[in-house]
């Protein structure tokens, strides 16, 4: 565990793995044959439980990244695989938004356009659709967890009505 402080080893019983898998069966809607891009370390419970155990038990196809997950590599994988579920840590989502999306919206012209009600809605809808497409365009959910989420990025996702869920670690 180390979501909000220094890392520390935590012993987790079998029932914690089972309860997370059972929870995923109850709330996630994956089916056999759905595709997942696994980018989180399997040595961490978040990645193991929500990018492998649940998907494996459902019968999903799990694609493991063979390199460190940079935004470029992740988007390339999303484009090729078109995952049904995206499980990420906040840092990945934050890098993508801060480097690829926010700079375009912070230009002087865009700041003015975002103040005009009807145009504002169109811009937000366009940004949301572009982000959905960049994430493969096929996902049923984006789950963000394993660390604290940057408030600016979370507010942005809420503003554009991007479909995501924030999870919280079972060892906290």
What is the meaning of each model-derived region?
Residues 4-6, 33-35, 59, 133-140:
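Short, surface-exposed connector motifs at secondary-structure boundaries
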Residues 2-5, 44, 172:
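Active-site proximal helix/loop that lines the substrate pocket
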Residues 6-10, 36, 46:
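Transmitter module of two-component histidine kinases
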Residues 114-162:
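Short gly/Ser/Thr-rich phosphate-binding loop of adenylate-forming enzymes
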Residues 18-35, 42-130, 163:
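Conserved AMP-binding/adenylation subdomain of ANL enzymes
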Residues 1-19:
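Conserved AMP-binding A3 loop
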Residues 11-13, 89, 150:
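GHKL-family ATP-binding catalytic core of two-component histidine kinases
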């Amino acid at each position: 565990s180390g979501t909000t402080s220094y890392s520390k080893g935590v012993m987790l019983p079998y029932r914690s793995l089972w309860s997370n898998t059972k929870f995923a069966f109850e709330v996630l809607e994956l089916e056999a044959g759905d595709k997942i891009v696994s980018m989180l370390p399997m040595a961490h419970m978040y990645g193991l439980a929500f990018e492998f155990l649940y998907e494996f038990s459902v019968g999903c196809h799990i694609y493991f990244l063979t390199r460190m997950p940079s935004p470029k590599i992740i988007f390339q994988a999303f484009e090729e695989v078109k995952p049904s579920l995206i499980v990420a840590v906040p840092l990945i989502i934050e890098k993508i938004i801060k480097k690829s999306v926010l700079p375009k919206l912070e230009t002087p012209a865009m700041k003015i356009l975002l103040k005009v009600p009807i145009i504002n809605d169109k811009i937000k809808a366009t940004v949301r659709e572009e982000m959905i497409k960049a994430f493969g365009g096929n996902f049923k959910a984006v789950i963000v967890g394993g660390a604290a989420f940057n408030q600016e990025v979370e507010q942005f996702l809420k503003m554009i009505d991007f479909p995501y869920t924030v999870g919280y670690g079972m060892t906290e």
